[in-house]
Swiss-Prot record:
GO terms for biological process: aerobic respiration; electron transport coupled proton transport. Its EC number is 7.1.1.-. InterPro entries: NADH_UbQ_OxRdtase-like_20kDa, NADH_UQ_OxRdtase_20Kd_su. Belongs to the complex I 20 kDa subunit family. Disulfide bonds: none annotated. This is NADH-quinone oxidoreductase subunit B 1. NDH-1 shuttles electrons from NADH, via FMN and iron-sulfur (Fe-S) centers, to quinones in the respiratory chain. The immediate electron acceptor for the enzyme in this species is believed to be ubiquinone. Couples the redox reaction to proton translocation (for every two electrons transferred, four hydrogen ions are translocated across the cytoplasmic membrane), and thus conserves the redox energy in a proton gradient. The gene is nuoB1. It comes from the Bacteria.
Length: 268
């Protein structure tokens, strides 16, 4: 191995570059990662700052933010993913050509962040699509996004052409687009992100290898009931509903019911 290295160094002195086809191919892909122009919330402001002159994303060949997913290699999920937006994220991901990568930027995209107990926020985009790199923070600084990009480049350098999922004549995998069911987002009739109480297991991603996840996302054990998700609630108009009882509101906020002593009020 040392002899090969000496030969390579000697050849470089004479303007000859020796490498393997695999390393050359990976070098080309890692040096021209085109992100999708796609921002969801406040993390997108930091993503925009990363592309400006101070941080100079062009050093990594990733300054070409594309308006079309068919011309993009990388999806940066920057911000809170609401359940109304989640199907569109999956559609955009399915339209990206292989090889395609995903960076989950910020606490909201990774686990729901401070809104994870809300009825309308997806608790992690990896419930729907695979994620290659996670960035913690609320919001992460541009330096964190640059570090994530360098981490992704290292992953690309380590790839072998005969082992990646997109090499050869294999068909690109289409990830199912969730639909709105009676109680929330569903895939094939199965609730993918229930409101409250149930632990979540991502079917696609682990933080290290992009394989099946074995751990569970922590979540409170108490089941919460939200009026708009309750079976007894019927919507009369966009701003009016029937069936919302005081008990439901108490369950929603997890406050014990307060009994009022009207006799005591009369004595006063």
């Amino acid at each position: 191995m040392s002899d090969d290295r000496e030969i390579q160094l000697e050849a470089e002195k004479h303007g000859v570059f020796l490498t393997t086809m695999q390393r050359f191919y990976n070098w080309g892909r890692r040096s021209s990662i085109w992100p999708l122009s796609f921002g969801l919330a406040c993390c997108a402001i930091e993503m925009m700052a990363t592309g400006l002159a101070r941080f100079d994303l062009a050093r990594f060949g990733a300054e070409m933010f594309r308006a079309s997913p068919r011309q993009a290699d990388l999806m940066i999920v920057a911000g809170t993913v609401t359940k109304k937006m989640a199907p569109q994220v999956v559609r955009l991901y399915n339209q990206m050509p292989e090889p395609r990568y995903v960076i989950s930027m910020g606490a909201c995209a990774t686990s729901g962040g401070p809104f994870r107990d809300g009825y309308n926020v997806l608790r992690g985009i990896d419930l729907l699509i695979p994620v290659d790199v996670y960035i913690p923070g609320c919001p992460p600084r541009p330096e964190a996004l640059l570090h994530a990009l360098m981490t992704l480049q290292k992953q690309i350098d380590a790839q072998r052409l005969n082992q990646v999922r997109w090499y050869g004549k294999r068909e690109a995998k289409e990830y199912p687009v969730p639909t709105f069911g009676k109680h929330g987002l569903e895939i094939d009739g199965k609730l993918i992100d229930p409101v409250g109480g149930l632990p979540l297991v991502s079917p696609y991603t682990s933080p290290t290898h992009g394989e099946m996840r074995s751990g569970m996302i922590e979540h409170p054990e108490l089941v919460r009931h939200f009026p708009i998700m309750d079976e007894t609630v019927e919507r009369e108009s966009p701003y009016k509903a029937t069936g919302i009882a005081i008990e439901i509101a108490h369950n929603d906020l997890k406050r014990p019911a307060v009994e009022v002593d009207h006799a005591e009020d009369e004595r006063r």
